[in-house]
Curated annotation (Swiss-Prot):
Places the protein is found: Cell membrane
UniProt keyword terms in alphabetical order: Cell membrane, Membrane, Transmembrane, Transmembrane helix, Virulence
The protein's name in its UniProt record: Protein PrgH
Main location: membrane
Segments passing through the bilayer: 142-162
Length: 392
């Protein structure tokens, strides 16, 4: 078994997985940033219970009569490391892999290569031995492959399934985004849609223009954190009008985190689980939605600490269900900009449902009167009228 400890990948992504044995010998699968699941085993075992298993959209099935081990391949966002997780019964094993080097997972032999580089066979003796070892098991390999894909409900031959799979469509969309694709995540959804997760409004607009001008004919939708929060907030306000929550975080779009108030939450554990499933249904690209309880004291404390750090004058007003910080005074343009930047940053973390900010500007009644010289200077208000700022 391959046990390389090499962790630095110098070849640019994206990457391709090539099968070196089994009935799908020679088939290749695209690897996107994030997780890709490979289900390996006998075709009839999948339907032994009388119904099809629930397999994630970002996964592939590889028919193998003996020695099948499910595994995941994880590609870092910066593509500096590729990790293979063997999902054995009772435990899992993880290891980093090298490019263009045969890797054995159970009885399956695979190879990972950059998409931009051709396949270069290595260790021919190992490949030949493995091929002979598996030859009797896959004499009718084409039939086994077609049966496996039919059982999964694809309704077509294996090659067409690969070409039309959500993973392949995601790879096409990833390619359409070109050199800017690092700013986005392409997520296959359970509703047969592809979702492009953008980081901000500018990237959202850019990606939508690319889809509109390109020749991509599949169903795709560009999303971002702010728009998704607004969309889901409308649903929550309709079906959970009394729910005390902050916002949803999409640091990992496949596993969003929903922040609820610890002090104002009255839902039981079972009710929270039901809510999590409903939120997951609203986000077809999400594998799960984690609900986290946050302290109201922490939310208000971070707001107040931030105002003090920015040296902004404010007053605090506590009221039922929230806190309002009023930023007030004769603020100049720099202070106003600093206040707005802080408020925007706070809302991106906590939302604006519990802590709110208001700005009350006051005119500087000394503006344009005269000049003050030194700490003990004075201001000439009018002929015969002098103003000495305190302290004297």
């Amino acid at each position: 078994m391959e046990t390389s400890k090499e962790k630095t990948i110098t070849s640019p992504g994206p990457y391709i997985v090539r099968l070196l044995n089994s009935s799908l010998n020679g088939c290749e699968f695209p690897l996107l940033t994030g997780r890709t699941l490979f289900v390996v085993g006998q075709s009839d075992a999948l339907t032994a219970s009388g119904q099809l298993p629930d397999i994630p959209a970002d996964s592939f099935f590889i028919p193998l009569d003996h020695g099948g081990v499910n595994f995941e391949i994880q590609v870092d966002t910066d593509a500096t490391e590729i990790i293979l997780h063997e999902l054995k019964e009772g435990n899992s094993e993880s290891r980093s892999v090298q490019l263009n080097t045969p890797i054995q997972v159970g009885e399956l032999l695979i190879l990972i290569r950059p998409e931009s580089e051709p396949w270069v066979p290595e260790q021919p003796e190992k490949l030949e031995t493995s091929a002979k070892k598996n030859e009797p098991r896959f004499k009718n390999g084409i039939v086994a492959a077609l049966a496996g894909f039919f059982i999964l409900g694809i309704g077509t031959v294996g090659t067409l399934w690969i070409l039309n799979s959500p993973q392949r469509q995601a790879a096409e969309l990833d390619s359409l985004l070109g050199q800017e694709k690092e700013r986005f995540q392409v997520l296959p959804g359970r509703d047969k849609m592809l979702y492009v997760a953008a980081q901000n409004e500018r990237d959202t607009l850019w990606a939508r223009q690319v889809l509109a001008r390109g020749d991509y004919d599949k169903n795709a939708r560009v999303i971002n954190e702010n728009e998704e929060n607004k969309r889901i907030s409308i649903w929550l306000d309709t079906y959970y009008p009394q729910l005390a929550y902050y916002r949803i975080h999409f640091d990992e779009p496949r596993k969003p985190v929903f922040w609820l108030s610890r002090q104002r939450n009255t839902m039981s554990k079972k009710e929270l689980e039901v809510l999590s499933q409903k939120l997951r249904a609203l986000m077809p690209y999400a594998d799960s939605v984690n609900i986290t309880l946050m302290d109201d004291v922490t939310a208000a404390g971070q707001a107040e600490a931030g105002l003090k750090q920015q040296a902004l004058p404010y007053s605090r007003r506590n009221h039922k269900g929230g806190v309002t910080f009023v930023i007030q005074g004769a603020l100049d343009d720099v202070e106003i900009l600093r206040a707005r930047q802080f408020v925007d940053s706070y809302y991106r973390t906590w939302g604006g449902r519990y802590v709110q900010f208001a700005i009350e500007l006051k005119d500087d009644w000394l503006k344009g009167r005269s000049f003050q010289y030194g700490a003990e200077g004075y201001i000439k208000m009018s002929p015969g009228h002098w103003y000495f700022p305190s302290p004297l």
